[in-house]
A protein has these predicted regions:
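Active-site-adjacent pocket-lining segments in enzyme domains
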Residues: 2-112
Length: 112
């Protein structure tokens, strides 16, 4: 969920658009990256993803770049990756405000 922070801390994302889990998104900016709330971000040779489920999106994105769109579509089909979540609360913008605030209050993504 937060692997992009390692890239940012190493200085590899300075001045680049990037994403990570929404609870740690502001940390990217502290290391010079340009945080965005998108699920998958490609900037140059770097591809970053938000929370754990967006890792599948990132994998398909990379596969498309490496092996072609048809191959990525075939893998998506064979794995039956067709997200239909039972709740529409997969981002802070969609989730109930009390849940967002609860998790922000308990967040451990604190760097000094």
């Amino acid at each position: 969920c937060t692997g992009a922070i390692l890239l940012a801390a190493a200085g590899l994302l300075k001045g680049r658009r990037a994403t990570t889990h929404w609870l740690a998104l502001d940390v990217l900016g502290r290391f010079g990256a340009e945080p965005t709330g998108e699920r998958v971000v490609t900037d140059g040779k770097y591809v970053t993803a938000a929370g754990v489920s967006s890792g599948i999106d990132m994998g398909l994105t990379l596969l498309g770049r490496i092996a072609g769109d048809d191959h990525a579509r075939a893998v998506q089909l064979l794995t039956e990756y067709d997200p239909q979540p039972p709740y529409d609360a997969g981002s802070p913008e969609k989730a109930p405000a009390h849940l967002v605030e609860e998790f922000r209050g308990r967040s451990r993504f604190i760097l000094t």
